């Protein structure tokens, strides 16, 4: 029973914690400040372990100057990819993913057809801009759409960890797979609760 209380809770972090302004602003005004504030709090949360897949870490580095990241970052956050050769995923995951992708492709096709119908009514640049926006909404919102997303899902499953992300597609699929997640807007409060 005592081991239960000593066991560290594992947390898998998405870049949205530090990059997405709606979430990041709970920690800092820019990604570097958000990382600094996160590190200050995370250092004191002794009962939590933090992980980030290597693909997500590389994505994060596109947005921050690595020289400005506190050295403690590399001590507190473990960069770990999921074991892609041993990960097991329920068949229903693939079944539902394929079905959803097919529906989205059909929706994307309808968006493209409507753009073609509007050719005489708008100039080409406006049509392309509108097409890109609607096509992106039809195909990408609410779905796992990158290898980074897959790594976050599989690492969370492998570690039996809590996923922290602002990506609605990841939240949706984490929920389907029984992965615990925390509303990112409440993540700082969660960290502070882990301290006290």
From Swiss-Prot:
Keyword Iron among UniProt keywords: no
EC number: 3.1.26.5
MF GO annotations: ribonuclease P activity
Any one GO BP annotation for this protein: tRNA 5'-leader removal
Keyword tRNA processing set for record: yes
Gene3D superfamilies associated with the record: 5'-nuclease
Entry keyword set: Endonuclease, Hydrolase, Nuclease, tRNA processing
Class of enzymatic activity (EC top level): hydrolase
Catalytic reaction(s) noted: Endonucleolytic cleavage of RNA, removing 5'-extranucleotides from tRNA precursor
InterPro entries: PIN-like_dom_sf, RNA_free_RNase_P
SUPFAM superfamilies: PIN domain-like (SSF88723)
Role, per record: RNA-free RNase P that catalyzes the removal of the 5'-leader sequence from pre-tRNA to produce the mature 5'-terminus.
Family assignment from sequence similarity: Belongs to the HARP family.
Protein name per UniProt: RNA-free ribonuclease P
């Amino acid at each position: 029973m005592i081991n239960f209380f000593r066991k560290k809770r594992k947390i898998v972090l998405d870049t949205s914690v530090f990059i997405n302004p709606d979430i990041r602003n709970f920690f800092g005004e820019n990604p570097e400040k958000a990382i600094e504030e996160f590190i200050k709090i995370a250092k004191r949360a002794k009962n939590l372990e933090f992980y980030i897949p290597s693909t997500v870490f590389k994505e994060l580095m596109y947005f921050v100057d690595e020289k400005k990241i506190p050295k403690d970052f590399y001590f507190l956050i473990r960069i770990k990819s999921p074991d892609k050769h041993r990960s097991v995923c329920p068949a229903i995951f693939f079944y539902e993913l394929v079905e959803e992708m097919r529906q989205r492709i059909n929706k994307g096709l309808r968006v493209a057809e409507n753009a073609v119908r509007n050719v005489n009514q708008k100039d080409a640049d406006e049509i392309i801009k509108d097409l890109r926006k609607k096509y992106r909404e039809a195909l990408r919102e609410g779905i796992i759409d990158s290898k980074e997303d897959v790594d976050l899902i599989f690492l969370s499953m492998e570690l039996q960890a809590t996923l922290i992300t602002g990506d609605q597609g990841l939240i949706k699929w984490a929920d389907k797979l029984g992965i615990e997640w925390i509303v990112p807007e409440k993540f700082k409060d969660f960290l502070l609760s882990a301290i006290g």
